[in-house]
A protein has these predicted regions:
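Conserved beta-strand-loop-alpha-helix hinge in the C-terminal portion
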Residues: 216-231
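ABC family nucleotide-binding domain
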Residues: 1-212
Length: 231
């Protein structure tokens, strides 16, 4: 992924609100990146552009050498479904569907057979420690459990890239550690992991930390994983 002079402006005319100011960023396959910065710095907007949820107002976004910032919405949706798993700060769970049906939802669009969808969804729920909650509705789950369902949903389509906006925000410290270790393991397996966080202890799991302020990158540093031993 390569972002060149990416700008994002919301509104128009006298109501224009610039959010990103000329972002230049190259992301290599298999990186583990944390994006940090104060509220309003543009972190989530940048993540939305990286994850094909939003178009930049100006600049060039390349994926594997191909420009993607000017492709049609249906092609953008296909890229999202095939390449990216999302974990949002809000849960976005279907209130009338149980945990495994929420987790399987990305697979429906990929035309995966029902039995395989169910098996993969339950496998992912077990991976995040919810094997005993597969039939529970969202209103029967705690906030932390809901967030883990979201993480399982992000993993179920076996994406190349995992984008997580405050992935541990609703979790206690022990569960946060388990979730981050899971993301570390997925990164070891070759997945690119990009998280937005305001917590230094969560960013410490990443090997590269990018800091935004007022829509600009003010720091981009690489470091050894503090929680990953030899990696």
């Amino acid at each position: 992924m390569k972002l060149s002079d990416i700008k994002k402006v919301y509104g128009s005319g006298s109501l224009e609100v610039p959010v990103l100011h000329g972002i230049n960023l190259q992301i290599e396959e298999g990186e583990f990146i944390a994006i940090m910065g104060p509220s309003g710095s543009g972190k989530s907007t940048l993540m939305n552009i990286i994850g094909f949820l939003d178009y930049p107002s100006a600049g060039t976004y390349q994926l594997n050498g191909k420009k993607v910032n000017s492709i049609k919405e249906n092609q953008l949706a296909e890229l999202r479904n095939k390449h990216v798993g999302f974990v949002f700060q809000q849960f976005f769970l279907l209130p009338r569907q149980n945990a495994w049906k929420n987790v399987e939802s990305p697979l429906i669009y990929a035309a995966i057979p029902r039995r395989e969808r169910m098996n993969r969804a339950k496998e992912m729920l077990a991976k995040v420690g919810l094997e005993d909650r597969v039939n529970h509705l969202p209103n029967e789950l705690s906030g932390g459990q809901k967030q883990r369902v979201c993480i399982a949903r992000a993993l179920v389509n076996n994406p190349e890239v995992i984008l997580a906006d405050e992935p541990t925000g609703a979790l206690d410290s022990k569960t946060s550690e388990q979730i981050m270790e899971l993301l570390v393991q997925l990164n070891k397996e070759g997945k690119t992991v990009i998280i937005v966080t305001h917590e230094e202890e969560i960013a410490a799991y990443a090997s590269r930390v990018i800091t935004l302020k007022d829509g600009m990158i003010t720091d981009d540093r690489r470091r050894a994983h503090e929680h990953m031993g030899e990696l």
